[in-house]
Amino acid sequence: MQRTSGKITNFRDLDVWQKGIDIVKDTYRTTRGFPRQEVFGLSSQMRRSAVSIPSNIAEGFNRFHNKEYAHLLYVALGSCAELETQIEIASELAYMSAETKSSLLEKLDHEMRMLRNLVKKLN
């Protein structure tokens, strides 16, 4: 999913959206290994939080006003914070390795920095 030119014509061209999709894939792969009793609990919540990140970026991109776009980027940031907390919980419950936790948190940190920078550009 790499851009072929420097032009951004839709949300798929945004690096922040692409990284968000990577977070979704990593979250789904990670939660596959969770205990069965978490299917409708932590696994489901983590997946919803992860999916919310690129979804809100895409929705915001297609809004007509920068204020609306920025609002949805803030929602995506909130979803990042939710997922960060859920990763901590999953780690405390020994549902993931320290390496997996570290990798996910590093990607989330990068995503949050990119989202904050995009909000600054819109304001």
Task: Describe each PLM feature range.
Residues M1-N123:
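Amphipathic alpha-helical assembly/interaction segments
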